[in-house]
């Protein structure tokens, strides 16, 4: 058997045979020629020590700038844990639960898209999960698993193909014994899809398919051709390129170690990677071009405040005004505002119900202080809505706030329904402030 050794000082190793780490670099030991196989960059010990978070990625990043950085071994392990974890996708009604591994769904979806003629440039982990990989103790936590497929979506046909492919892939994850013949794409959509979004205009071309999980850990598959604004704040601007790790899963016969693992690139679409990473570690709120942030940015901003993040400077007051204005542009109707707030509370506070009240009071304070685009009655209407939701949260938790700040709601007596009776007084809703964490077993007097 003819063996050849390929030395790489940049970590380029051809898969197709056996591999070993040796000395200050890597040897690839192949049974045949090294040419013709897939190539993957390897991280590890290029100079006698383990890879550090400060390694530059000029040899691997598409645009070698300060936007990119190489993940260290600890971060690679966290990423591997996320992609290898089995996540249940819960079906509605009598549909069975799907056991879905992120790395596997990415592999299946990508392969079928390419079979249909839709090229996938790369796949990335995005959002809070990417931030968690980079810094585990950031305080952000993560729920949704946001996976981005950078794909070519030229027209309506490609968007429809993406939808069909994802729904068809779900059939592969149904438990054995399930009769798949009569299950239609529409049935799968109703059973397993939390939401679908399609945006197609001059600046943005992307679609989102969110697979539902009862604990809020949805798997979100996002297919992006172009997207003008990819982040809201620096701490959620991170994306991790998964291609080298996915190729390692597919090709390597040996497990990863500290000295033998693929080189994985992290990128900050905010700008300077180290600046954004410093914001993440020190819980700093910063952004660029705040006028581009959509209406949901206000809700994310208040969530960061509740989690202990603080503005980078006093100029954040201007940012608050931008975000309030945009929120009321995107959600101008009080009904839309209520649906958006209720949805946000439901999706972002799973297991954190005790923080909902503080969150709503923080939102109340920001809206009260920084809203300049509304008529007085519209502003009061929104503030009253936030207060009502806060009181509902307290009721759900069986907690009563400080007596001096309680708003009383009266149930009308039966005779009030009489058309001739008009002496009923509706109490004005007042803001609720910091909750004194006590419970009371009796009714309290009203001020």
UniProtKB/Swiss-Prot annotation:
Q: Say where the protein is mainly found.
A: cytoplasm
Reactions it catalyzes: RNA(n) + ATP = RNA(n)-3'-adenine ribonucleotide + diphosphate
Protein known as: Terminal nucleotidyltransferase 5A
Question: Induction: what does the entry report?
Answer: Increased during osteoblast differentiation.
The listed locations are: Cytoplasm
* GO MF terms held by the record: poly(A) RNA polymerase activity
Q: Which InterPro entries match?
A: TET5
**UniProt cross-references to SMART domains, sorted A to Z:** DUF1693 (SM01153)
Give the species this sequence originates from: Mus musculus (Mouse)
